[in-house]
Design a protein with these regions (language model features):
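N-terminal trafficking/processing presequences and adjacent post-cleavage segments
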Residues: 1-9
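Short, aromatic- and cysteine-enriched interfacial helices/patches
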Residues: 4, 15-20, 91
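Acidic, low-complexity, intrinsically disordered interaction modules
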Residues: 16-21, 26-73
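Mixed-charge, Lys/Arg-enriched low-complexity segments
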Residues: 61-92
């Protein structure tokens, strides 16, 4: 979890936007799959994902997911990889 926070802090902005990407990244939590629109580091140093639920059914409202210790390690690693790829695109 701390590695994600440091990665976003080093990026400088604290906010990554995926809204206009043709292929938005997805992440799974508790049997649900979410399409990510943005990743934000909040003022209290927590990471929050904003997106929509796409599995098992599509939900027509924004979800705000706080990334904490309740997430599986594989999902946290996946989020970290998404952030790293986006940062690499920005500074390439």
């Amino acid at each position: 979890m701390e590695s994600i926070i440091k990665l976003i802090e080093n990026e400088g902005g604290g906010f990554l936007d995926f809204f206009f990407h043709k292929s938005k990244p997805t992440v799974q939590k508790d049997g649900y799959k979410y399409e990510i629109f943005s990743i934000e580091l909040t003022e209290d140093r927590t990471v929050e994902l904003t997106g929509v639920q796409v599995y098992p059914y599509y939900e027509h409202k924004l979800c705000h997911l706080k990334v904490d210790n309740t997430w599986r390690k594989t999902s946290i690693n996946h989020i970290q990889n998404i952030i790293q790829k986006e940062i690499d695109k920005i500074y390439k």
